[in-house]
Amino acid sequence: MAGSHLPIAPRKGFILVTEPTKKYVFHKVYDSDYVANVASSDADLQTSTVVEGTRAGTILIGASRERIGFDGSMNYEILRQLAAQATSLFPVLRDVQLLRAYRGFRPYAPDHLPVIGEDSTVKGLWHSAGHEGAGIGLAPGSAALITDAILGRQSFMDATSFSPARFEKVSQ
């Protein structure tokens, strides 16, 4: 697109949403596999327990990761696995009804770092991509890095490791 290529690929994931309920979960809870799964380059299915209460009283249950392209199908076995993992941590959730499940695609860079900066081959093209599941949370920092670079200002951190140029040899 626009004469540039980055090796950004989708990582599919599922989330379960419960009915509004009593406040059982006061903080986001991750199991010990979560960090390893986020950092993994394995294309196979990985699940780890993430349970988070919302202001509306619903509880979000995840997380799964799988590199299978843009396959948008629902996988009920994965949903069952996520529910089982969550209820093993929070047995009280066994009696809570699920409202829905949804899936999405996290943009993933093979080195697990976002791509932030000016394209080395297409002048004027700036990238902010590959943040995987942290894109919304990292958006302000990514925007600040790009703004500072465009304006020629020193930024709050060195963005060299996020440069799109790190993939030049990979994409040629």
Regions found by a protein language model. Name each.
Residues V115, D119-Q172:
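C-terminal lid/capping helical subdomain adjacent to the catalytic/cofactor pocket in oxidative enzymes
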